[in-house]
Amino acid sequence: MLSGLIQRFEEEKMKHNQERVEELSLVRVDDTISQPPRYAPSAPMPSSMPTVALEILDKAMSNTTGATQTQKAEKAAFASYAEAFRDDVRLRQIKRHVNEQISPKLKSDLGGLKKKRAIIHMTLLIAAVVALLTSVCTLSSDMSVAFKLNGTSAEIPQWFKSLNPMLGVVNLGATFLMMVCAKSERSLNQQIDMIKKEVMKKQSYNDAVRMSFTEFSSVPLDGFELPLT
């Protein structure tokens, strides 16, 4: 019985050693997953939007600095088109919807500023006329100018000369009002020009998003047709 156990133990040991040798003799494979070979793209690459944006900006900057409002509006339109080419598709759509919501409000503000400027300009003209009349009256009374009527000379009455202090105050007030109106009108002109520029930028951006650049590719700017509203 003991000899049978010893023989069985020896057989198990030999079998275990043989399995161990077979396991060690196996070739190990790297654990990393093999990747397929990379091939260079053979399809023609579409025109890069950032490249087109840089070309548009170069076109805008190649001209001289805009001296008139029309030239400044032109450069703002160029910048908006370049921005539309540079932005991502989703960002373009977000900006387009925001511009459509803001543009009517900007136009309403622009109309209000123009009405305010017209009122201030009319006030400026009235103040200028008042200042001119009071200056002429004060100067005539101070120089004691005599007028000839039917061959007889008529001097300015004394009661009119007594109005010189009041006319001087009116002239001073009209002059001060002219200065205030002129300053306010300049400020309004700057605001109006700025709003006009913003309206031009937003309209140009939306036009760039909507339009299809057939001279660059047959695919619209956003990759799909947009309904023109």
Curated annotation (Swiss-Prot):
Compartments reported by the entry: Host cell membrane; Host Golgi apparatus
Domain of life of the organism encoding this protein: Viruses
One term under GO cellular component: host cell plasma membrane
Protein's UniProt keywords contain Mitochondrion: no
Annotated keywords: Host cell membrane, Host Golgi apparatus, Host membrane, Host-virus interaction, Inhibition of host innate immune response by virus, Membrane, Transmembrane, Transmembrane helix, Viral immunoevasion
Topology relative to the membrane: Multi-pass membrane protein
Residue ranges of the TM segments: 119-139, 162-182
Protein's UniProt keywords contain Membrane: yes
GO process terms (BP): symbiont-mediated suppression of host innate immune response
Pfam families assigned: Orbi_NS3
Main localization, broad class: host cell
Family to which this protein belongs: Belongs to the orbivirus NS3 family.
Subunit (UniProt): Forms homooligomers via coiled-coil motif. Interacts with host OPTN; this interaction inhibits innate immune response.
Protein task: Plays a role in the inhibition of host innate immune response. Interacts with host OPTN and thus inhibits the recruitment of TBK1 to the host Golgi apparatus. In turn, downstream partner IRF3 cannot be activated and IFN-beta production is impaired. Facilitates viral particle release either by increasing plasma membrane permeability through a viroporin-like activity or by viral budding.
UniProt-recorded name of the protein: Non-structural protein P8
Gene: Segment-10
